[in-house]
């Protein structure tokens, strides 16, 4: 996955692609978010990357960062909510153990060592 960093490399890598299909390659941006960004900014789905200017690129970059941060905050808030209500997965997060049913007898030794040191 790529990151959206530089205008020149983005345009040179995706010259013949549509803006929407070029944005799909960026980390943290999926088709649903791209469609939302297109509605907010008034993008044309069939506009080529080669016809894009720097102002449009910087606007897309700001929107992509905004949507990526929203998703990141949502995940963080969900984990904190589970910790707060102390359900099973929340307790596993608090104890720094595997959450999704992974094996702990032979794996996940490092977190369990750290827990023993704290106690």
From Swiss-Prot:
InterPro entries: Rbsml_uS13_C, Ribosomal_uS13, Ribosomal_uS13-like_H2TH, Ribosomal_uS13_CS. GO terms for cellular component: mitochondrion; ribonucleoprotein complex; ribosome. One of its GO terms (molecular function) is rRNA binding. Located at the top of the head of the small subunit, it contacts several helices of the small subunit rRNA. Belongs to the universal ribosomal protein uS13 family. Part of the small ribosomal subunit. This is Small ribosomal subunit protein uS13m. It comes from Acanthamoeba castellanii. The lineage of its organism: Eukaryota, Amoebozoa, Discosea, Longamoebia, Centramoebida. The gene is RPS13.
């Amino acid at each position: 996955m790529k990151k959206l960093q530089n205008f020149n490399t983005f345009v040179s890598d995706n010259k013949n692609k549509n803006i929407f299909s070029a944005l799909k390659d960026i980390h943290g941006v999926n088709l649903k978010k791209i469609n939302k960004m297109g509605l907010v900014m008034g993008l044309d789905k069939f506009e080529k990357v080669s016809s894009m200017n720097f102002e449009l690129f910087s606007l897309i970059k700001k929107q992509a960062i905004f949507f990526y941060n929203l998703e990141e905050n949502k995940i963080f808030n969900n984990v904190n909510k589970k910790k707060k209500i102390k359900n099973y997965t929340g307790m596993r997060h608090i104890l720094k153990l595997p959450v999704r049913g992974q094996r702990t007898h032979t794996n996940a030794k490092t977190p369990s060592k750290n827990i023993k040191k704290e106690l």
